[in-house]
Amino acid sequence: MEMSKFLESRREALKLLGAAPFVAAVASAQQSGPGQGRGGRGRGATHFEGPPTPSPTAIPGGKPLLTLYSISLQWADYDEAAATAAEAGWHAIGWTVRGGGHVLPENVARDLPKAVAAAKKAGLQVPIIITPIRDAEVQYAETYLDTMSKLGLRYYQAPPLGQYDYAKDLQPQLDIWKPRIEALEKLNEKYGTTAVYHTEGGAGNIGGGGWDLWLAIKDFDPKYIGMDIGLGHCTMKGGPEVWELIRFTHKSVLSIACNDIRWVKKTDPPKGPRRSDPSQDWPWTAEYVIPGTGMVNFRDHFAYLKSIGYAGSILHYSEYFVDVQGASQPISILRPNVPKDMPKDLYVSNVERDREFYARMLAEAGF
């Protein structure tokens, strides 16, 4: 049966995930000598600090960059979007460089420099851009990478690898991507750029749980191919302790996308957007919520990122809804029409609160 093959592959991955902290601890003990192994941490259980090798994004003494995803600023031009992000205290902005985004694919050579200049004018960095490039055959792919290289940009978010066909064997559906990813790796090597594939939750998405995405990319050089771990999306797939996935995939984790979710009964009154489920009669579903009010274990995620020297982007990806006075229904914080649907000061106060939450979690993690 196809599902049994899928579950067998997943079990193998999870066995490795479970072994990873132990392997890291043994390696550390061998390096340190008797009695000098790495200590544990956490509440009620031992949490090994993980492998001592820094992540590829590590900057000596550096900290993760709190980065606002510009999809929530589509109502503003480059200058206003960057100024608004800075007003809310963000360190950086992740421009949408795709259809319907701030920079359109056909205009990337002309307009991406303008967007980067606007960010710099506002005192923001641009550690990552969001693109449609999942392989080397995507239209304008080489123009994207050439422009990024000239601007000194390294990382771009790549979209998920499509949808599973559950009527067919699943492993070949991962394997078919490997030559395409290899071609993109070579293109990235040419331009000094790096693709980070996003773990998009939801039924049927290839790579949505993280473990299967890692199986697709694990043999590629993390200088050029990596993962953008969506903490909320992976929690949606695996529960609050799925953060331990990062322990096994740490060399490939080059970007972190943050949102928060909780599991709710479908009969509960909705407080935010919900994901569809593979089984429509299943009573539980996932709902997006304000960061810090859901199931995502930000504390332990960030503590582990600290232990591996992570200094990449923390990309704010929240998809919760906001109550607006006079509105007939809550408004999405992900795609608000400001000021028509939501006053600008209300938008700013929400994303500022979110930034303060992430900053507090990073501080508690020792950053």
Name every feature range the model reports, one short phrase each:
Residues 2-8, 12-33, 40, 44-67, ...:
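Histidine-acidic metal/acid-base catalytic patches
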